[in-house]
Amino acid sequence: LFRSISLGALLGVSGTGSCHELTHRVNSPFDLWLGRWDFALSFGTNFATEHVYGHHKNLGLVGRDPVSPKRGTGFYTFLTDGQLEQWRNGFGIEKTRLEAAGKNSLSIHNRVIHAWLRGGLVISLVFLASGWIGFGIWFISALVSKYILEGLNFFSHYGLIRLDGEPITSRNTFSSCNPVGNYFTFNLGRHGTHHE
């Protein structure tokens, strides 16, 4: 159990920070590919689509940004509802993109479907390589990692709203200038700067 939690903390802190930065490099196919596969290790497969093309566009807009919890929302409610909404938004983004290109939204061109396939492949490989015990260790570590990622989202955006049409500024997120935390999370604590 301790090893699972330790691995989850490693994936959730340093892994999430590096994956997050790599998925923003949409003009670098290798970096994007690496970030997406890295997120597949910790149930973050949809992140590269919804985060980059949804959250950054709709930051703080109530009802359109599932990563910005409304004031009064509890963490576990945010965890479940926010996840479902992130998947729904990811599919919506892909549906719009693929329909504009004249392609079926449920085709192999859908990046969210790619994300599910990556996640399924990781789960299968972990199980085949290490059986139920290894799968259990990985599963717990992936959950810990996902909780850390969503905790960062929760505390970076909690209760902050932005009006439609208002520009995104550093005041639309909570930030931390702690040098140790920023070192381990690739400056993810400086969240306002990231969104500007």
Language-model segments: what does each one mean?
Residues 41-42, 129-130, 147:
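Transmembrane helix irregularities
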Residues 5-118, 161, 167-196:
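Membrane-embedded catalytic scaffold of the fatty acid hydroxylase/desaturase
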Residues 131-144:
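Interfacial segments of alpha-helical transmembrane regions
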Residues 12-16, 141-149, 153:
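Alpha-helical transmembrane segments of multi-pass membrane proteins
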Residues 118-126:
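Hydrophobic, membrane-inserted alpha-helices
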